[in-house]
Amino acid sequence: MCIRDRPYSVYGGRKGKNDYADDINTRSMMTNWLGGGSVYMPAMDGKRVPIELSLALHSDAGYNPDGQSTWGALAICTTDFNDGMLNSGISRFASKDFAKALRDNLVEDMTNTFGSFGKRYLWDRNYSETRLPEVPSAIIEMLSHQSFPDMRIAQDPMGKFTIARSIYKTILRFVSSNHDEPYVVQPLAPNHFSVEVDELGYASLTWNAQLDKTEPTAKPTSYIVYQAEGKGGFDNGTMVRSNIYNVKLEPGKLYNFRVAAVNQGGESFPSETLSALYNPT
């Protein structure tokens, strides 16, 4: 497939007269062009790429007069178009289910991490980004640039991670449900990681599983301990089943360690990196 052979109508529907409208519409039109002919868009011409969802992430505007509470998140879908049907023949209410799940799960995950997070509307309106895609589609609006409480979260790396993980979990659940398949969510990184070196030069690494309060399947089943020596990079890791790992250190050599959690959903981000040095006296 060559992306250069896409029709001009995909990205230039306004024929150069309105770049703003073309910019809004292009991603949806490209989705349809790529997915046309697949099982998700069988009645359209295209490249048969099996794209089954469309999601737009928008920063928001607005603030609460108290200056203390978050403006939160809202979601948007479009059901009143093409007789309420998508190209595959399924109802556009699948988009509403998707949008509602995105908003509700995001509010739950953010509230668990940061305290109360604003739950705003579920809009069923005529927006290009949810009208044009021929697969279930949604817009999620969040992180208002006019709201200081929201911007505190937006600039916090944990805020960005929590949002991204929440959206990942919703997409995984939604797709798995549509296919009637089980799912397992990737675990969170281990926490309370520590290393202690005894008088014989053995390093004892310990950590705790970090559980996802809103997703029981994210429990780790094993861990990977990564090790680096001296100025070298980390190795490919050692799989362990428990939350303790012992290793003999060579005198005078610096060691670096980090740990990742694993389950059937994948591997977590690594823990913080801890260093150990054995200098016998």
Annotate each predicted stretch with a short phrase.
Residues M1-D5:
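Conserved small/polar residues in nucleotide/adenosyl-binding loops
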Residues G13-A21, P42, G84-R92, D150-P157:
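Second-shell loop/turn segments in exported
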Residues S38, S59-G84, T113-E181:
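Active-site-adjacent mobile loop/cap segments within catalytic or ligand-binding domains
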Residues S91-W123:
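Active-site-adjacent substrate-binding region
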Residues R173-T217, G266-T281:
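Pro/Thr/Ser/Gly-rich low-complexity, intrinsically disordered linker/stalk tracts
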Residues Q210-A228, F234:
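Solvent-exposed loop/turn segments flanking beta-strands in beta-repeat/beta-sandwich domains
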Residues D235-S242:
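Short beta-strand segments within Ig-like beta-sandwich modules, predominantly Fibronectin type-III
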Residues N246-F269:
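Beta-strand-rich modules
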